[in-house]
């Protein structure tokens, strides 16, 4: 989701901020580097950072403060926080908290004391924005039922596993072994050329229409539960498909419908931030950043010419007369 992009962007931005936030920067004139006898001071270094990246960093700091204030009115379940933390670890290729803290320091130049500090600074803000985005949005049972009735066919989901092989001969060999009673998951691990098969034994989980290549989708959505397909050819090779479950009732799809309607009706995170900025009292004290937080004025509403009842009648009569005259001219011609 977008919040994950926001998290990575925030880390990158705060990497720059770390250089600007040095306790001695800009005050002592201490040299950062010496080149052929010429010293480049930390003041020069920070001034250039401010010139080039100052607006982005200042916006980030203000936004983080506003989100922190707004967090007081938002309740986020611990399981959501834990899920986001695990997702972030996966994104940067680590498993433990210590590995994550090391990666933050080595990859992003971010030093935090512990996991809790990282969660408060980087995991919570996107979650707060997400909660604010759906604030006040309500979906009724009647609306969900109506959406289901109108979009039933496109909402259906199928759960399936597959064994992908390169040629039809191998596919027939796999089918023979399945008919002989061999286990589908074990055969997927043995035969499938799908890179994910080693980890998931061919299990694709639930998917909807449009998620798979057309040939695969056509076969899977027309199969019964526990049915095994004949070889299905696609651009990837030959698939042996096993359908294991299906969601096609309102009760099974209600959560998906609810999430879809929430996404359609909620504000974007950009809109949430814009609203927070509009409500805040921001006084820019540095001339370099004057106007940075000014919000664009709403476009003026164009006045619609008013026609009172009498004028409207006159105009209608004129149009009718013009139409009659045109008709008479056509008859004469």
Swiss-Prot record:
Residues 155-245 form the PpiC domain. It catalyses: [protein]-peptidylproline (omega=180) = [protein]-peptidylproline (omega=0). Residues 1-19 form the signal peptide. A lipid is attached at residue 20 (N-palmitoyl cysteine). Gene3D superfamilies: 3.10.50.40. GO terms for cellular component: plasma membrane. It is found in: Cell membrane. GO terms for biological process: protein folding. One of its GO terms (molecular function) is peptidyl-prolyl cis-trans isomerase activity. Residues 303-333 have a biased composition (Acidic residues). Its EC number is 5.2.1.8. A lipid is attached at residue 20 (S-diacylglycerol cysteine). Residues 291-333 are annotated as: Disordered. Keywords: Cell membrane, Isomerase, Lipoprotein, Membrane, Palmitate, Rotamase, Signal. Disulfide bonds: none annotated. It is a lipid-anchor. InterPro entries: Foldase_PrsA, PPIase_dom_sf, PPIase_PpiC, PrsA_foldase, Trigger_fact/SurA_dom_sf. PROSITE patterns: PPIC_PPIASE_2, PROKAR_LIPOPROTEIN. Plays a major role in protein secretion by helping the post-translocational extracellular folding of several secreted proteins. PANTHER family: FOLDASE PROTEIN PRSA (PTHR47245:SF1), PEPTIDYLPROLYL ISOMERASE (PTHR47245). Belongs to the PrsA family. This is Foldase protein PrsA. It comes from Halalkalibacterium halodurans (strain ATCC BAA-125 / DSM 18197 / FERM 7344 / JCM 9153 / C-125).
